[in-house]
A protein has these predicted regions:
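Anionic-ligand binding patches
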Residues: 2-5, 12-185
Length: 185
């Protein structure tokens, strides 16, 4: 079995990744390695910086993931600042910002950076809308307020398997899995 390190401290992200990759002969190992996250408006730029920084300190194959919630009514806010905004105002704060808003369209975007003899980027997008209230206790982050297209449930109301079928991270992981299935060393 090959080892592939996932640089994250987020157990929810780790669980999603393991479920997507479990059919491959690859062991996903969590690595809690702090790296600076540059302030940029582009998730791909942030991921590439993280890959470059971590590859200078860690020599085994690894991947990292950055994602953001982009809300149309708020001019794509919080976007790449999603983690900070969630830690600061949380889901309640986002719902307050959208009080009275008729446009609740939003999308999650995930960028996975894989480093294995060089950087490779995989992306995934999940379109949907922001619910009017917090619903569900599953998942993490904005999951209890994001409803993907073609679902009346929020990510917070879904099982991990169900969420993965809609998830931006799930789509980015699928793209990485297709790459890994081709036997890339």
């Amino acid at each position: 079995m090959k080892e592939l390190y996932f640089i994250t401290s987020n157990k929810g992200k780790l669980k999603e990744a393991k479920e997507k990759i479990n059919h491959l002969d690859i062991e996903i190992i969590q690595l809690k390695l702090d790296y600076p996250e540059i302030q940029a408006s582009d998730l791909k730029e942030i991921a590439l910086y993280g890959l470059d920084f971590c590859s200078e300190r860690f020599k085994s194959p690894f991947f990292l993931e950055d994602s953001g919630l982009f809300i149309e009514e708020l001019n794509s806010f919080p976007g790449p600042y999603s983690r900070y905004v969630h830690e600061t105002i949380g889901n309640d704060g986002i719902l307050k910002l959208l009080l009275g808003a008729s446009n609740r369209n939003a999308y999650f975007k995930s960028v996975i950076g894989l480093y294995n003899n060089g950087p490779i980027i995989f992306e995934g997008v999940s379109k949907g809308k922001i619910s009017k209230e917090i619903r569900g206790k599953g998942g993490f982050g904005y999951d209890p307020i994001f409803m993907p297209e073609n679902s009346e449930k929020t990510f917070g109301e879904m099982s991990t398997e169900e969420k993965n079928s809609y998830s931006h991270r799930g789509k980015a992981l699928d793209n990485m899995v297709k790459y890994l299935e081709n036997g890339v060393e």
